[in-house]
UniProtKB/Swiss-Prot annotation:
GO terms for cellular component: cytoplasm; mitochondrion. GO terms for molecular function: carbonate dehydratase activity. The gene is CA5BP1. The lineage of its organism: Eukaryota, Metazoa, Chordata, Craniata, Vertebrata. Substrate binds at residues 121-122. Belongs to the alpha-carbonic anhydrase family. Transmembrane segments: none annotated. Pfam families: Carb_anhydrase (PF00194). It comes from Homo sapiens (Human). This is Putative inactive carbonic anhydrase 5B-like protein.
Length: 195
């Protein structure tokens, strides 16, 4: 089996040739870069702290366990077509409906499972962020992934610290509520000073 790089200091390969049952922190291959500053992934990877691990694609079977019990099976994450490998993800404008249906990704917020969702619902704080999307989903154990998330967030350059362990489900929330929750989470002292 081909082994991934030992660290995130160089350009990472793809997961297409790997079939890993358990992933380590240096084996996550969903990375971001500043789409305004860099035109391509290679230039960003050569920058100091250019690679930032923020998540991993999963292939969830209908019988697999989930840290959040919803009483119904999780859907299978679909594989991406080659033409969908790279996208500029922004809160606005939303991606086309075809992309929303065919691109599924699992996000993590600290130690909490968020859910499999379309790319159009990427968190608003990730504006002007481009994500390198791998074509194949990776089976992994939830327990191992939950242990990797805090370390992965610390590798994320120039991000504000997470102030809450709980993230509400924004799938059906109005945009105004989402913005208010994000502002409140990042400015807790401003609210207390106002009272």
């Amino acid at each position: 089996m081909t082994q991934p790089p030992a660290s995130t200091s160089g350009i990472m390969g793809t997961l297409s040739s790997w079939n890993l049952k358990i992933l380590q922190i240096n084996q996550l291959h969903l990375v971001h870069w500043n789409a305004v500053k860099f035109e391509n992934f290679e230039d960003a990877a050569l920058e100091e702290n250019g690679l930032a691990v923020i998540g991993v694609f999963l292939k969830i079977s209908e019988t697999s366990g989930s840290p959040v019990s919803t009483g119904r099976p999780k859907p299978l994450a679909r594989k991406l077509r080659p033409a969908q490998k790279h996208w500029v993800l922004q809160s606005r404008p939303f991606l086309s409906s075809q992309v929303q249906e065919n691109c599924k990704v699992t996000y993590f917020h600290r130690k909490h499972w968020v859910r499999i969702r379309p790319l159009r619902t990427t968190p608003p704080s990730w504006d002007y962020t481009r994500i390198c999307i791998q074509r194949e989903m990776v089976p992994a154990r939830i327990r191992v992934l939950r242990e990797m998330v805090p370390e992965a967030w610390r590798c994320f350059p120039n991000r504000l610290p997470l102030l809450s362990n709980i993230r509400p489900d924004f799938s059906k929330a109005p945009l105004a509520y989402v913005k208010r929750w994000l502002w409140t989470a990042r400015h807790p002292h401003s609210l207390s000073a106002a009272w």
